[in-house]
Amino acid sequence: MKLVALASLVALAGVTSVSAAAGTNYFAYNSTAVTTFKGVYLAPTGTTHWGPNQALNDDDKELDFGERLTLTGLNPGLYDVKLVDQKGRTCIMHRVNLTKETSFEIRDTSLTNCK
Amino acid sequence: MITRRAVLIGVPLALAVAGEARAAISGMAYASNEKDNTVSVIDLAQMKVVKTVPTGQRPRGMDLTSDGGRLLVCLGDSNRIDILNTKTWAVEGSINTPDPEYAALRQPGNNPLYVSNENNALVTVWNIDSQKMLGQVPTGTEPEGMAVSPDGELICNTTETTNMAQFFEYPTTKNVANVLVPPRPRWAAFTHDGKAVWVSSELGGTVTVIDTKTFKILDTIHFAIEGLRSTFIQPVGISITHDDKLAFVCLGPANRIAVVSVPEHKVLSYVETGQKVFDANVKKYLLVGERPWHASFTPDEKYLLTANGLSNDVSVIDVAKLRVIDTVPVGQQPWMVLISPS
């Protein structure tokens, strides 16, 4: 029972860390050669508590290659990032560290596990 | 900060070219590092970074006064352009303007400064001595490249989303022509005789040559590289030699610079910034220089330096030999490189 309660707290903390508004601006750089993303979701590493679609923060609601996306509502921490490209393929980047860095890059090598 | 990757690539390459003859170069080059919020100062004689200057947030476009004494750095996230003294690196003044991406000085006289304000669909005009705004001009969506003709009478701005090259007269800033070009025009460069302007289209994969008297399209230059998907060919920066014979076009993720005959509008060859270099120490081929977006010549035009955004370095191309002869690690995501005129 205690374990369940603890797990719930951890999960809740995860949700909070994604949804809580923070003062720092975070960014994702799309450094792929030709891939545009219509979905960019972050969840605390090891969870599937995906936050809102951050791609909607962009003017055209997509993260184009060569473009930078402002990420909102994040606190420092480790995140998994779910990327959805224009063809609907989904790719996961694991353990993106936004503890010290305020940005991360999506490269072509980040897209090797897309389904 | 230099990434580990940049160091691993840069050191063996430096070893590989250490014995290669190179004419003496003097002066300084400046690379704006978008992700690091710094400008790297490269001593061309040593071909290494001798100073890293902290800047405001997101340094991208830059321009230099004609004597090289002041470097103007567009700081997109700080909503200003800082004017840096290139001897002391003190900030001599700031122009407060929203989301500046590129800026171009009118010559001669170092004034005014034309700024593309990306998110405001404006070109703003500034006096850099008083840092006062002289005017503003509405543009299409997402203004990008800024260029001023050699005689200072014509201003060209490219609008990334509306796919136009827009032309304005000096000093009225009257809009005299709008020319549709292929998607995502990023950069404009006038030929030195002022007769044409070359506009790169990143998504279109082309360079459009426009007559500056009639504003008619003279030609559209296409690029094709064997073994490379056409979508990887994304032209951005264009550097034209002073004799208007050669243009060097940065092709982004193609990791190459196209060498184009200016009179014929014809691609002559491609220089790989990601050139394969044999290193006697490590016995393997190395790739350097990923995603070049902008380049600048040394004053004698013997060398061309490219800012490579993904490999965090600057490639040095021997213009006569058309090959990369050196690589200088700089900060993260170098956007543009400029070279002091003296």
Model-inferred region functions:
Chain B
Residues I2-L8:
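N-terminal export leaders
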Residues M1-I2, N33:
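Short aromatic/hydrophobic-glycine micro-motifs
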Residues L8, P12-S342:
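Predominantly soluble domains enriched in secretory-pathway, periplasmic, or organellar proteins
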